[in-house]
């Protein structure tokens, strides 16, 4: 049986980031996840020496710029003794949809033109990282400004856009069907 661990995340943050509180991992709010049962069963003689604990995450409203954790502690077992040095776990939440993942750097190739203040037009090309926001949405940094530093929220908020991908291929061009895209400010 597992239960939430109220101290583990604070210990983790202090050990890994000390006074750099901007980098601290955040405790995922219980309103953002469901654990139907905090009990799991390991099969006797099974090939895999572990058991899975299903956790359902509701990602809507979570920021890809934050590190979210669910701290858990093993509190009881039926047949064995618990090792007090190995009875805690930090479950890291990784946002992912069909278009982007926090785990892997999902890149989009960008080509276009940019008009500078004096009217001069120049060509631009870059690979842009996409961040998952919801089932059908990703965030992309627009233009050539660099918001690669996740901690630079001012740049992220100023230069990012949200791309919403339609659920069905409703656009056709030259016999090929495409998902419609809606683009709006972040």
Q: What residue ranges belong to the model's regions?
A:
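Short helix/turn-capping signatures at newly exposed starts of structured segments
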Residues: 45-47
